[in-house]
């Protein structure tokens, strides 16, 4: 039987971009459980909560770039919506959603 040709090109997925009410943040510290401390691009430090649908599927470490949705009733807290991979962070920089300087400053 003939061997099938494999498609070496992987389809490029759309990068999740922040919509209204969401900010890009960098994880500063892990508190355990489902809580992290994040520094956001709007200049605020927030206590982030990792919801159950992400907790076991996506492992979040210090220095990761994440998308967060600040709470309306407590602006110093937020929910983590998405974790960006390094290639997705590069795509965000290429699309001028965020600058590389800002990410480096937030990572410390």
From Swiss-Prot:
Transmembrane segments: none annotated. It holds the Pfam family eIF-1a. This is Translation initiation factor 1A. Keywords: Initiation factor, Protein biosynthesis. Seems to be required for maximal rate of protein biosynthesis. Enhances ribosome dissociation into subunits and stabilizes the binding of the initiator Met-tRNA(I) to 40 S ribosomal subunits. Residues 11-85 form the S1-like domain. It comes from Sulfolobus acidocaldarius (strain ATCC 33909 / DSM 639 / JCM 8929 / NBRC 15157 / NCIMB 11770). Belongs to the eIF-1A family. The gene is eif1a. GO terms for molecular function: RNA binding; translation initiation factor activity. InterPro entries: NA-bd_OB-fold, RNA-binding_domain_S1_IF1, TIF_eIF-1A, TIF_eIF-1A_CS. It comes from the Archaea.
